[in-house]
């Protein structure tokens, strides 16, 4: 919306924007720039930097125009710049709206979301597969770039299941080494191992994070159960 700001026109309040998943710092930064020009090209400031740079002589007299797309851009930049710990704290309530499974660590989920999130409210819709594997079509296993089709995917899942089951300590590094090591041993590209495993454990064409991160977060038992389901679907 590129309209002059007015409550009469239903412009969002601060509380509305927070409820829509915008960070306080991004809102303050954006609103400060609506009626004030800091000079220079820079737009993204911390609250402390804004306080230092603010100059009454640079306030504009013309009515401000509220642009939700610009605020969204500010918000995504703030999210990317946050420490992983700060983002995990901010994201956890939104993660838990979608992921009720206690064993899925919200901090690990936050780590795969941080660079891909514009607003905190975007988070829940990306995570439904963690609690429940969705019904999916086996056509998802077809990926031309990595030369994967349903036959190759079935073969790969059957080879990878015992390898994943044999991991002694289920860490992200161990899962990574298992999958990459298999690709090296099979003499194929990493994607030919990663793609079918990721589809089997997520049931989604697009996911935050790849096969390694998702398997690690789901845990051994759930990963193996989902691979079994993938094998069963592909054998039909």
Walk through the language-model features, giving the residues of each.
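Alpha-helical recognition segments enriched in aromatics with Gly/Pro capping
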Residues: 1-79, 92-93, 195-206, 229-230
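Amphipathic alpha-helical interaction elements
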Residues: 19, 76-80, 118, 165-168, ...
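Small-residue-rich helix-loop
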Residues: 84-186
């Amino acid at each position: 919306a590129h309209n002059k700001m007015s409550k009469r026109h239903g412009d969002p309040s601060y509380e509305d924007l927070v409820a829509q998943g915008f960070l306080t710092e991004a809102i303050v930064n954006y609103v400060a720039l609506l009626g004030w020009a800091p000079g220079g090209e820079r737009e993204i400031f911390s609250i402390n930097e804004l306080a230092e740079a603010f100059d009454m002589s640079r306030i504009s007299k013309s009515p401000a125009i509220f642009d939700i797309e610009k605020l969204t851009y500010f918000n995504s930049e703030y999210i990317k710049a946050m420490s992983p710990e700060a983002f995990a704290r901010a994201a956890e309530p939104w993660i838990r709206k979608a992921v009720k499974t206690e064993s899925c660590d919200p901090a690990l989920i936050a780590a795969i979301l941080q660079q891909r999130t514009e607003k905190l409210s975007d988070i829940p819709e990306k995570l439904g597969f963690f609690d429940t594997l969705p019904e999916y079509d086996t056509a998802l296993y077809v990926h031309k770039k990595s030369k994967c089709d349903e036959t190759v995917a079935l073969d790969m899942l059957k080879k990878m299941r015992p390898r994943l089951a044999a991991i002694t300590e289920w860490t992200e590094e161990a899962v990574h080494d298992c999958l990459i090591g298999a690709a090296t041993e099979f003499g194929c590209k990493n994607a030919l191992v990663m793609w079918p495993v990721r589809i089997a454990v997520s049931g989604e064409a697009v996911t935050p994070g790849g096969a390694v991160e998702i398997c690690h977060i789901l845990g051994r038992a759930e990963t193996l159960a989902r691979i079994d389901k993938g094998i069963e679907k592909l054998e039909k």
